[in-house]
Amino acid sequence: MSALRQNDRWRWLTAGAVAVCLLAFTLLIGLLGWQGVRAFWPQPVDQYQFQPPQGAPLMVLGETLDRQQQGDRWRYVVKTGNRDFAAPDFRVIVSQGEAQTRRPAEALVLQRRSGGNAYGWLVELREDNEVLTARDRDALLQQRLKQVHEQLRQASNIRRIEMARLNAQLESLQQQADEQRRGGHFSLQDQSELDANSAALHKRFGALAQQLAHLQHESQRDTLVLRDVQGDDHLIPLAQVVAAWYPNSLSLGQKIGHFLSQIWQFVSDSPTSGGSENGALPAIFGTVLMVLLMSVIVMPLGVVAAVWLHEYAGRNALTRLVRIAVVNLAGVPSIVYGVFGLGFFIWLIGGTLDQLFFSRSLPNPTFGTPGLLWAALTLALLTLPVVIVATEEGLSRIPDNLRQGSLALGATQAETLWRVVLPLAVPAMLTGLILAVARAAGETAPLMLVGVVKMVPELPVDAVFPYLHLDRKFMHLGFQIYDLAFQSPNIDADRPLVYATALLLVAIILSLNLLAMVLRHRLRER
């Protein structure tokens, strides 16, 4: 009877621990979700008239973040925006008595590429300083915004794809010519061919430059005049505006549509203002690409090491020592792996590769500098113990009778391993992959040493051969969270983006893990 009571105590204890873990995870997701939604949901804009304890009345327009009564005084925290002409964009105001408040339906919010939001009233739209007239100025504003965004998109494609491809061809021609000169095989005919090819490429580049300049000029023609709460007018180019809306006059359906469009803009656009505003596409792309490349590297190494330890290595002191070393590697701080990756992969291996295969680019390093390949290798080394242990656990659960039966039927040990043992161990391998992805996607400290940066001019994948550039630096959601939370000059404005980026990172990790779990379940059914 006492044994049953003891078991009941342990059962309740374990059930309580599971409940606490689930509650903590739910609260974490709830906090990230609630705070992250605030970054995209259109907040109402209030117009206040404050009466400070001393001084003249104060007019303020913005989003109300907090309001507290302190005796006969009221304390307000208002996001007033307009950072470039009415800094700061967050204000704490103490009013003598409750402030007079109203929500003007015509109040306009502008999400800009830099400088934060702008709040005010639309006075007029201009094209080349000529005032545009229309019955519905809001519809005209949205139409002009779409037109400007399309021009900016075309200009970006020319700059990132077509001009980048021509630049790569010009650099390749110049490097080939320099290599021939160093080898003493550069003739007058080679020089004439080089001049002809370079002239043709420069001609195409000049045509693209003219087209790019035309698009940039067209995108700068449209401007709007915004009147702030103090009555001052400000000229804002539409090329600097990401989105414009009237939050106080939106219906529920319009708010949902705006919310979805803001989420899409966040996950599909590039960041501006040093990475502290607008989109997170490069960070999403870099995170997923790095995790996939790490998985491709770590899975073969981990599976081969586990198979050797369990199937081929004898039970001796050396094997026990290797297992102890593998298990202890999982406890090494991640920053140590970053230092190892910097010293071994980048300086030693990368520097050697540059001298052997990319000497014509020296002293500019190609692989002797932090990049995507070294980040993936470093995290593969970091997660290797997890894959080895999980795979070896799966191999140990396979009955020896299956191995012995296969050998008795005439199969070799290699055939038994390939046709009997490994198919049964695939779910365990995928379990190791799930654990490796979960850890690698959230690592930040080692990546700061081996390849991640705050902003990148180009993605590791583009239209220039060889299309996947393993030597390029990349952005990562974990580092972006750190940068927004601790390195931003305006943390109050970036706080919602911190929560939104953290929620996005959790969603990506859960999606990758769910994909691996579905694959494991299907293989298990087979």
Model-identified regions with their sequence ranges:
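Interhelical loop and adjacent transmembrane-helix boundary motif
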Residues: 274, 451-503
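Membrane-topology segments of multi-pass transport proteins
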Residues: 1-15, 22-275
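Transmembrane alpha-helices
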Residues: 388-392, 398-399, 413-451
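Non-cytoplasmic
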Residues: 339, 343-349, 429-469, 482
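Membrane-interfacial helix termini and adjacent extracytoplasmic/periplasmic loops
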Residues: 259-278, 337-381, 451-452, 461-467
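Membrane-embedded alpha-helices of multi-pass transport/permease systems
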Residues: 300-305, 336-339, 374, 381-402, ...
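Transmembrane-helix boundary motif in ABC transporter permease subunits
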Residues: 294-326, 339, 347, 516-525
